[in-house]
Amino acid sequence: MTHSLAIVERLPGHTEVMGGFAALARELGWDVHLLFNRSDSFQFVDYLAARLGIGGDRIHDWSYINDHEGEFDAILLNTSCVWLEYGGRLQQWASSRRLMVVHHLPEDIELNPHGASLYLTPAVDPGKWIFPLYGSPGLPESLCENPHFSQHQGGVGHPELPGLVTIGALDLKDVGGVSAYLKAGGRVVHYDRHRCHFFPEERDYSQHVGLGGAEFMQSLAGQQPIFLWFPIVPESHYMVYRFSGALIMGVDLNCVMVMPEQFRQLYGFPEDAVISYQSSVMETECLGKLRDSPAKQLERRKRLAAWAGERWEKNLGIFRGLLGLR
């Protein structure tokens, strides 16, 4: 008999994370239903359904759980805020079936002690965090002969800086670093839900606004080579508890990821799998790594793919335990 899992997202946003749990459940032989807020025009659910082979009859509005909770063997609440909508029903779900709740802060458990907790960063509990992946990763067959790196990047010591891609609002991020990179002759391609007004006069800055999941992934995949930058400042919540969905795309598309060293250490990316810097992307060592040869960038991507494979197996072990499987 096939078991069924409902993954519920009440709020607009966060739907890209749902794919990580759905992929694990599918791998373990579970039937998966995705429940989300249909007012979210930027949702990833349609993309995930096509990517993971989830039929349209298993895609619902978030409120579907209110009348159909008995149909599921397990319920996963995709963000810690969601449980506020359900009140006392959480205790019922926890006692009658396996309830899982994605928490972000340690205090969330005190507010909602029902169900099994899991996390999207290892900051709270390294043994209970899952890095969302859309399947068992593998290195693209064409990677070794990818012409884009030699076409656009240049060789060792080439003065040209690669274009950097960044995803999400730049408010509360390193806007100064973005500006400095542009002034140094680099290009920045920015994806966000809303129009950014920080760089109206910069000709080497471009933005893609308001793309839905499938359109977004198609556009992002076309930005070859993909140097994906996380311009996060030291005091940001992203450095501890808050998960950046852009990380999923960085690993899934096997990008060369560029990030603060503190961020690399948080997620345990190997030093040779990403390009990291202490406080600024403009540090001499970081700029040198950005100008590395295509062969060196290929080594980083291979190492990242290996890390993702290891992480997928760890994810499976954690999720299997949460579902009560041996």
Q: Where would I find each of the regions flagged by the language model?
A:
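Nucleotide-activated donor-dependent transferases that construct or modify glycoconjugates
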Residues: M1-P12, L228-P234
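Nucleotide-sugar-dependent
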Residues: F227-I248, D252, P260-Q262, L266-G268
